[in-house]
A protein has these predicted regions:
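Hydrophobic beta-strand positions that form the internal "hydrophobic ladder"
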Residues: 69, 116, 158, 208, ...
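Conserved strand-to-loop turn within each blade of WD40 beta-propeller repeats
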Residues: 72-75, 119-122, 160-164, 172, ...
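Residue-level detector of Asp-centered blade-edge/turn motifs that repeat once per structural unit
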Residues: 64-65, 110-112, 153-154, 202-204, ...
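Surface loop/turn motifs at the tips and blade-to-blade linkers of beta-strand repeat domains
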Residues: 49-52, 95-98, 139-141, 188-190, ...
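Blade-level signature of beta-propeller repeat domains, shared across WD40, Kelch, NHL, RCC1
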Residues: 350, 354-375
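A short helix->beta-strand "capping" segment at the edge of beta-propeller domains
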Residues: 29-55, 88-91, 334-335
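WD40-repeat beta-propellers
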Residues: 78-83, 125-130, 167-172, 217-221, ...
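Canonical WD40 repeat/beta-propeller blade segments in eukaryotic WD-repeat proteins
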Residues: 54-61, 98-108, 144-151, 186-200, ...
Length: 375
């Protein structure tokens, strides 16, 4: 039986009253969970230990109005940024202490201006009211640190993925688990490592995708609730998968072939690209690893034929133009880098465009989020 616990808002209030009695047990449980999160340091930086006291932005999203940005931090803080207010205003940012563990992924609920769903490295799924910080609903996937969550286009379903290698599909109305998605054909693979990205298709309401550390993208049919196909290649270590119509974009935490494109109509990889970073030819840059950006996140611009990728090591954000992407065998010459932010001071973990496509927000290993105007 799948170990998933669901709690309503009234139950949340009751549980809060019992917290003091459970502190000793919680401290022991929390320490155990923190020890089990050693893998998370590899996601954050290949050469540094995880620091629970340093506030880093792991996930962020514009809402559909372009007025608000939700950002999740390593300290368990949820930040809501009001784009209609000046940055120096007290109303520009509201902060809510949601969890003692990192918020690893979040999404705004479709057709709802005030509800955010987020997941934590402790295994919690929380729905939060953006204007008050009140927890509306909580679900716990016990002993399963969660890395990703996504809503279906109509907001009726959401899916999660994490440490235990399974994608779970939930009914948003009842907040109940529909099914832990598995394969039913042995000629198809299943995930053999942690899942870092889940994505519902906006074009096909019956299509859901997942990817992670096992270099495999699984495709699920929502109607049969099972694996229907797969793609091989990307080593995903963050919000590193995006869809636009039939085009799938992925980025990898690898030193080579970090950007891969797939055509879902043919279930075929159509492009593999190296994240080349030009450096001055000097003694400090003879090691090729110095010129590599290990990528975490990617996003299609909703209004034109560009996409953004972000990464670490060489802390980088780059925007590509794929306007000439009209053939089955795409070469690097057909994908043009049109804008770079190179040698950022901190690893860049996440990015998002507003719905108009004229602004890009990105988050990194520092508290403040940053913007690019794209006009």
């Amino acid at each position: 039986m799948d170990s998933t616990t669901i709690t309503s808002i009234s139950q949340v209030d009751q549980n809060n009253n019992q917290n003091n009695e459970q502190n000793n047990q919680n401290e022991s449980s929390e320490q155990s969970l923190r020890e089990n999160l050693d893998f998370f340091q590899n996601v954050i930086d290949a050469n540094s230990n995880f620091d629970f006291d340093r506030e880093e932005c792991f996930t962020l999203r514009y809402d559909d109005t372009c007025q608000n940005i939700a950002a999740g931090y390593s300290t368990g803080t949820l930040g809501i940024y009001n784009m209609e207010k000046p940055e120096e205003s007290q109303d520009y940012k509201k902060s809510y202490n949601i969890s003692t563990f990192p918020i690893t992924c979040l999404r705004w609920k479709p057709y709802n201006k005030t509800t955010i769903i987020l997941v934590t490295a402790e295994g919690y799924i929380l729905q939060v009211h953006s204007k008050s910080g009140k927890i509306l609903q909580e679900i716990i996937e016990e002993n399963n640190p969660l890395m990703c969550v996504d809503y279906s286009l109509d907001g009726m379903l959401f899916a999660t993925g994490g440490n235990d290698k399974y994608v779970r599909l939930y009914d948003d109305n009842t907040k109940t688990l529909i099914k832990k998605l598995e394969r039913h054909r042995y000629d198809l693979p299943e995930h053999s490592n942690r899942i870092f990205a889940v994505k519902f298709s906006k074009k096909d309401p019956n299509l859901l995708l997942s990817g992670g550390w096992d270099n495999t993208i699984l495709l699920y049919d929502i109607r049969s609730r099972e694996v229907s196909n797969y793609l091989y290649g990307p080593h995903i270590c963050g919000d590193g998968m995006d869809l636009k119509d039939d085009l799938l974009l992925t980025v990898s935490w690898e030193k080579e072939d970090q950007i891969q494109l797939f055509d879902l109509r043919m279930n075929k990889k159509i492009g593999v690209f190296q994240m080349n970073i030009k450096e001055n030819n000097n003694e400090n840059n003879k090691n090729k690893l110095d010129n590599v950006s290990y990528l975490y996140s990617c996003r299609f611009n909703p209004s034109n034929n560009t996409f953004c990728v972000t990464g670490s090591n060489k802390n980088y954000l780059r925007i590509y133009d794929y306007n000439n992407l009209n053939c089955d065998n795409i070469t690097e010459e057909r994908i043009k880098a049109i804008r770079d932010l190179n040698d950022l001071k901190h690893p860049c973990y996440c990015c998002d465009y507003n719905i108009k496509g004229n602004k890009l927000v990105y988050g990194s290993a520092k508290t403040k989020i940053d913007f690019l105007n794209l006009i």
